[in-house]
């Protein structure tokens, strides 16, 4: 009998070893699959725990930042004799309102308000408009909010000098506006001069901070700020 014939007879007559081997392999594959599923579950669980821990740390971090910003604001208000004409609670409420419509968290805005409060001639509604304008400017120019606050604060504090600094940032004042602003300052009507400057800032940058909150990144930032 040829080798081929012998193989045919052996395969046809005795498959018990082959079947045993297949069953064993099937069990091993099944056990391996179960192990993989368990491992995936463990990995997913680890990532879930890691995400929760990370989120908790982020919340605690933001809470600390806000507490420090509020402490700084309170100190400046006290030092300036509440020159801005707004209480700390009124400022925090406004910061919260801005958080609802922009990508700036209230802790960031409160910190910026502390800086703006150091400019004693910026008061009441002018103060609020100046903060909103700083957010718009920072958004358009892609700069830090505090840097924008410093620039606008200095310009509003000394309008006749600040015009030049604002021009460097792309704010265009007509000769008539410049003349009017300087005249108002000379007459002791600084707040009216400030309003003219804020109106021009609105023309240049107005609505940018709110618009930025409308895209996917802005919406995600707003959601994060809400926590």
What is the meaning of each model-derived region?
Residues 1-26:
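Generic start-of-chain signal for non-secretory N-termini
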Residues 8-11, 17, 44-100, 111-118, ...:
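Small-residue helix-packing and pore-constriction motifs in hydrophobic alpha-helices
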Residues 15, 26, 33, 213, ...:
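Membrane-interacting alpha-helical segments
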Residues 22-45:
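Membrane-penetrating hydrophobic segments
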Residues 119-123:
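The substrate-binding groove and active-site-proximal loops of carbohydrate-active enzymes
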Residues 142:
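Arginine/glycine-rich "motif VI" loop of SF2 helicases in the C-terminal RecA-like domain
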């Amino acid at each position: 009998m040829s080798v081929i014939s012998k193989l045919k007879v052996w395969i046809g007559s005795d498959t018990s070893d082959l079947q045993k081997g297949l069953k064993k392999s099937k069990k091993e594959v099944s056990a391996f699959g179960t192990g993989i599923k368990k491992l995936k579950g463990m990995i997913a669980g680890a990532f879930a725990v890691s995400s929760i821990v990370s989120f908790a740390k982020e919340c605690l971090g933001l809470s600390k930042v806000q507490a420090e910003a509020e402490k700084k604001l309170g100190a400046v208000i006290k030092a300036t004799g509440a020159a801005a004409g707004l209480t700390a609670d009124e400022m925090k409420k406004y910061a919260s309102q801005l958080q609802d419509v922009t990508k700036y968290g209230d802790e960031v805005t409160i910190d910026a308000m502390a800086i703006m409060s150091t400019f004693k001639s910026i008061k009441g509604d002018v103060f609020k408009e100046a903060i909103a304008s700083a957010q718009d400017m920072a958004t358009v120019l892609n700069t830090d909010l505090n840097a924008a606050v410093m620039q606008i604060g200095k310009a509003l504090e000394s309008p006749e000098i600040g015009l030049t600094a604002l021009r460097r940032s792309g704010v265009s004042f007509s000769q008539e506006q410049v003349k009017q602003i300087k005249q108002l300052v000379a007459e002791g009507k600084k707040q009216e001069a400030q309003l003219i400057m804020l109106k021009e800032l609105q023309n240049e940058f107005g609505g940018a901070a709110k618009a930025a909150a409308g895209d996917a990144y802005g919406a995600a930032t707003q959601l994060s700020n809400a926590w």
